[in-house]
Amino acid sequence: MENVPKENKVVEKAPVQNEAPALGGGEYQEPGGNVKGVWAPPAPGFGEDVPNRLVDNIDMIDGDGDDMERFMEEMRELRRKIRELQLRYSLRILIGDPPHHDHHDEFCLMP
């Protein structure tokens, strides 16, 4: 037998119509990775409000303690009045006295 080099016959395949195209990328890259160089600016006016909001919150924490104390005192007073009215109404029911209106608390438009 003779040593005759054999030719390798390479058969090329015809492209398949339903096959998706390659997404690219090298040997060590995942296809569809991060796109570099694309930058979107923040919304207009977005950065202007942030420092002001922080300053307002700090002022509210530091300087508005008196307002908060006043508000809490008003809430305590309202709760006390509501409790008193509920107790008065409950006592009238227990005693059997029919409820009547305190006309001095009402506002009337008639002269």
UniProtKB/Swiss-Prot annotation:
Give Gene Ontology CC terms.
Answer: cytoplasm
Sorted alphabetically, which InterPro entries does this protein's record hold?
BEX, TF_A-like/BEX
UniProt keyword Zinc present: yes
Q: Which UniProt keywords apply?
A: Cytoplasm, Metal-binding, Ubl conjugation, Zinc
| GO terms under biological process | signal transduction
Region ranges (Disordered): 1-37
Residues that hold Zn(2+) according to the record: C108
Quote the Pfam families the UniProt record gives: BEX
Q: Where is the composition biased (Basic and acidic residues)?
A: 1-12
Q: Where is this region: His cluster?
A: 100-104
Example of a GO MF term = signaling receptor binding
Post-translational modification comment from the UniProt entry? Ubiquitinated. Degraded by the proteasome.
The subcellular location is: Cytoplasm
Primary location class: cytoplasm
Q: What else is known?
A: The mouse orthologous protein seems not to exist. A publication described a sequence that they named Bex5, but it probably represents a pseudogene.
Family per record: Belongs to the BEX family.
Q: What is this protein called?
A: Protein BEX5
What is the protein's species of origin?
Homo sapiens
